[in-house]
Amino acid sequence: MVTPAGCLGGRNQGPREIPGTAFPCSSRAGQTGQAVSGAQVSSWRERQPFGGSRGPLHILGTDGNVDTTGKLGLVPTPPRIQKETKQGALCGMKPPFLPEALLTVWWLPFVAVSLCLF
């Protein structure tokens, strides 16, 4: 069994300071499967304002005072409105783009032929 540094054989020697740290060894350091501060956890839970299962339900919007047991108080989302596109599905390209492209490239075959002739 491995014991923490500063604890003698895992025996209950009382709180001892571990060299290089500010934390004492636990009196239960040699015992496995047990919480070191089990009693403190239960008393901490008792002090919480929304203890138990009421905490998460309160956060999610369930109101325990108005007969809504088990129902979440979700706000309905507004309907999605799809805008109609004025120019179709071409992402902003105007429809007469094809003739403009042909006007800018019509001279390319003539230049190629004239280069071959020289």
From Swiss-Prot:
Q: Where is the composition biased (Polar residues)?
A: 28-43
| Tree of life domain | Eukaryota
Q: Where is this region: Disordered?
A: 1-64
What is this protein called in UniProt?
Putative cytochrome P450 family member 4F30
